[in-house]
Structure formats: C-alpha cells, structure tokens
C-alpha cells in the first residue's frame, strides 16, 4: 500500500515537472521588433498626393484633431528617411 502511494506521488511529481517544463522547451523563437518587416516604400510624390487628398475641413468639423495638431504631426515626420527609401 505504501509503495503504491509513493509511486503515485512520484508519478504526479514527474507529470507536473514535464508539464511545467514543456512551454520552456517548445517556445516560439523571439524576434526583434522590426528585423524581418518589409517596409512599404513610397516616393515623395505619393506622400504629397496623399496629403493633398486629405479634407482638412471635415477633420476640423468632426473635432477629433485640430489643424494645429495635424500640422505638428506632419512636421515631426522624418521625411529624409522617406525620401531615401522611396527612390525607384
């Protein structure tokens, strides 16, 4: 009787150890955030056409952002990197 209880406790301990260790053994590889991401490249002409097509009147009327906030956001964009990446 004592052997049976000891063997069941040992079996339970082995099962717990294996079930706890399996996520550590078979974990998906961790990647850097932007290592394998391909960025979509756009030329400056496409960027300017997109900005011209924005209806700032509707944006101001809705009240989600003021025009000053929108312009500040556009000024903070790094256009040098975009210009270098967009050449075809």
UniProtKB/Swiss-Prot annotation:
<dbReference type="GO" id="GO:0030431">
    <property type="term" value="P:sleep"/>
</dbReference>
<dbReference type="GO" id="GO:0040011">
    <property type="term" value="P:locomotion"/>
</dbReference>
<keyword id="KW-0964">Secreted</keyword>
<dbReference type="GO" id="GO:0031987">
    <property type="term" value="P:locomotion involved in locomotory behavior"/>
</dbReference>
<dbReference type="GO" id="GO:0060179">
    <property type="term" value="P:male mating behavior"/>
</dbReference>
<dbReference type="GO" id="GO:0050714">
    <property type="term" value="P:positive regulation of protein secretion"/>
</dbReference>
<dbReference type="GO" id="GO:0007188">
    <property type="term" value="P:adenylate cyclase-modulating G protein-coupled receptor signaling pathway"/>
</dbReference>
<dbReference type="GO" id="GO:0045475">
    <property type="term" value="P:locomotor rhythm"/>
</dbReference>
<protein>
    <recommendedName>
        <fullName>Pigment dispersing factor homolog pdf-1</fullName>
    </recommendedName>
</protein>
<comment type="function">
    <text>Probable ligand of isoforms a and b of the calcitonin receptor-like protein, pdfr-1, a G-protein coupled receptor. May not signal through isoform c of pdfr-1. Involved in locomotion; more specifically mate searching behavior of males, independent of nutritional status. Involved in regulating the male-specific expression of TGFbeta-like daf-7 in the ASJ chemosensory neurons. Plays a role in circadian rhythms of locomotor activity.</text>
</comment>
<dbReference type="GO" id="GO:0007567">
    <property type="term" value="P:parturition"/>
</dbReference>
<dbReference type="GO" id="GO:0005576">
    <property type="term" value="C:extracellular region"/>
</dbReference>
<dbReference type="GO" id="GO:0010628">
    <property type="term" value="P:positive regulation of gene expression"/>
</dbReference>
<keyword id="KW-0732">Signal</keyword>
<dbReference type="GO" id="GO:0035641">
    <property type="term" value="P:locomotory exploration behavior"/>
</dbReference>
<feature type="signal peptide">
    <location>
        <begin position="1"/>
        <end position="21"/>
    </location>
</feature>
<dbReference type="GO" id="GO:0007189">
    <property type="term" value="P:adenylate cyclase-activating G protein-coupled receptor signaling pathway"/>
</dbReference>
């Amino acid at each position: 009787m004592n052997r049976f209880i000891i063997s069941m406790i040992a079996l339970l301990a082995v099962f717990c150890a294996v079930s706890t260790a399996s996520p550590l053994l078979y974990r998906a590889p961790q990647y850097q955030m932007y290592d394998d991401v391909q960025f979509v490249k756009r030329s400056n002409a496409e960027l300017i056409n997109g900005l011209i097509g924005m209806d700032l009147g509707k944006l101001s009327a809705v009240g989600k952002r003021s025009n000053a906030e929108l312009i500040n956001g556009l000024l903070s964009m790094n256009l040098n990197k975009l210009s270098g990446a967009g050449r075809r």
